[in-house]
Amino acid sequence: MLRKISLLLLPVFVAINLVHSSPEIMKNLSNNFGKAMDQCKDELSLPDSVVADLYNFWKDDYVMTDRLAGCAINCLATKLDVVDPDGNLHHGNAKDFAMKHGADETMAQQLVDIIHGCEKSAPPNDDKCMKTIDVAMCFKKEIHKLNWVPNMDLVIGEVLAEV
């Protein structure tokens, strides 16, 4: 279940395509991002509270605070090779991943730039998981400003269809 809910988080590390509907691309990217979630859930012994955090992430007024949710995002990003060993976005790999899953070059770069800006604006934190929470919340805010939030009904529908 956690793997399925994590599908909602791909946009934290990938981009959008102008040719297609941005929410549709976000949905596609989310579906691909979560493929490593079962491994991360097992490796980190993630509780159900993390599932709730990931499920609620895109709600406009929801604030994710559970450190383990940040750890889950880090695990996924590491498995997909979109972050460097320090936990920072690997610009080239993240852009390539986004383009592989439907984003055009311009939008992939735009999202990489947003994430990079969020990394720079997040307060210093030696805890990688909490730093990821700060970056993710900043990113979510920017995605809401652009009206690129994926349609949750469509995401959940596709997740359930895969079960």
Curated annotation (Swiss-Prot):
What does the subunit section of this Swiss-Prot or TrEMBL entry state?
Homodimer.
Q: Which CDD domains does the UniProt entry name for this protein?
A: PBP_GOBP (cd23992)
Could you confirm whether the keyword Acyltransferase appears in this record? no
Keyword terms, alphabetized:
Disulfide bond, Pheromone response, Pheromone-binding, Signal, Transport
Disulfide bond sites:
40-75, 71-129, 118-138
UniProt GO molecular function: pheromone binding
GO terms under biological process: response to pheromone
**Name used for this protein in its record:** Pheromone-binding protein
SMART domains the record matches = PhBP
Q: What does this protein do?
A: This major soluble protein in olfactory sensilla of male moths might serve to solubilize the extremely hydrophobic pheromone molecules and to transport pheromone through the aqueous lymph to receptors located on olfactory cilia.
Q: Which tissues does the record link to its expression?
A: Antenna.
Q: Where is the signal peptide?
A: 1-21
